[in-house]
Amino acid sequence: MSDVAPLLEVRDLVTTFPVRRGLVGALLRRPHEAVHAVDGLSLSVDKGEMVALVGESGCGKTTTAQTIMRQVDATSGSVIFEGRDITTLDAGDMRPLRRRMQIIYQDPYESLDPRFRVRDAVLEPLVVHGLAGSKSEREIKLVDAMSRAGLTPPELYLDRYPHELSGGQRQRVAIAASLMLDPELLVADEPVSMLDVSVRAGVLTLLDGLRSKGDMGILMITHDLSTAAHFADRIIVMYLGRIVEEGPAREVVRNPQHPYTRALLSVVPRRDPREQVTPQILVGETPNPVNIPSGCRFHPRCPVAEDRCRIIDPALAPAGPNHHAACVLVEERNR
C-alpha cells in the first residue's frame, strides 16, 4: 500500500436487510430481525490496482459491491471515493460520480438490452449522462472503447444484436460500454463465472490490461481463488459478512493463515500434478446471516476450532507484511 490516498476506501461498512415478521410474528410481538449481509467491512483499492474479494456464495460479496455502487443503501459506515463519502450524497450529487464508477455484471446474457444493437448498447452511457457530443466524437470514442475491449475490428460487431454474439463477446460489449465514460473505478462482479472456460482467460486478461495501462482501480468479486491468485494484486477473503483474511495475493495463496482460506485453497487445482493436497471439506452450510454464531462466526465449520472460538470474536491480526487474518491461532503465533 502506498502513502497516497486510495481511490476507494470502505470503512466499517454495514448493510442489513429487515426480515418480515409476518402476521403471527406481529401478533406475538416477536422482535424485528435482519439479514446481516455486510457486517463491519473495511477495504481499499488504489489506482492501478486490482483487488479480489473472494468467498462462497452468500458471504456478502455482491452486496458489498452493490453498496459501494449505491445500488443498495448502507446501514452504517462510509464509502470514500475520491475523498468524498458517497453514502451521504443525494441522487443529484451522486450522478457525476457515477460516471467514474462503473460495474460489470455477472450475467452477460441479461446485462444487455436484446433490442439494442452493439453500437447503441456501447453508446448508451454517453446518452444517459448527457455526454453524447457530436457524431464524429461519438464514433471516435466508440471505436476506441470497442478496440480496448478486444472487439476488433469494431465494424464486425457494431450492427449485431446480443443474440448474435457469444457469451465472451457479450461481456466484452459490456466492458466496452463501461469504458465509454473513462471510469476510475471498475467493479467486476463475477465477470467470468457464466462464461465458457475457453474464453474466461481472455476476459480476465483484458481486465488486467485495463488496470495495468492506466490509473483505473478494479475491485473484482469472485468465488474462484485461482482466478484471484493469478490476476489480483491483493486478495480479501470474506465469510458471512466479514473479512477473515487479507494480504498480497501471492502471500495469501502461498501462506494462508485462516482455516477458511486454507479450505478454499485446498480444492484449487494445482499446475503440478505431483503436488498432492488433501481437500479440506467444510462440514455443514454457511450459517443463517439472520442468526450469526457467537464468537468466531466460522467456528461451527472450522476443522481446528477450540472451545474459546465459541466466545472470542477475533479481529484481524498481523500475519506478515501487509497480511492479516481474523483467528485466535494467528494472534497467538504472532505475539
Spans of features found by a protein language model:
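The feature captures the beta-strand-to-loop junction immediately N-terminal to the Walker
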Residues: 54-56
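A short, proline-enriched helix->beta-strand linker immediately N-terminal to the Walker B motif
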Residues: 180-184
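Conserved ABC transporter NBD signature motif
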Residues: 77-85
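Conserved ABC ATPase "signature" region
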Residues: 84-85, 136-156, 209, 265-266
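P-loop NTP-binding/switch modules centered on Walker-like glycine-rich loops
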Residues: 191, 195, 199-277
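Conserved ABC ATPase signature
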Residues: 161-165, 169
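Short catalytic/signature loops enriched in Gly
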Residues: 3-6, 19-29, 34, 155-156, ...
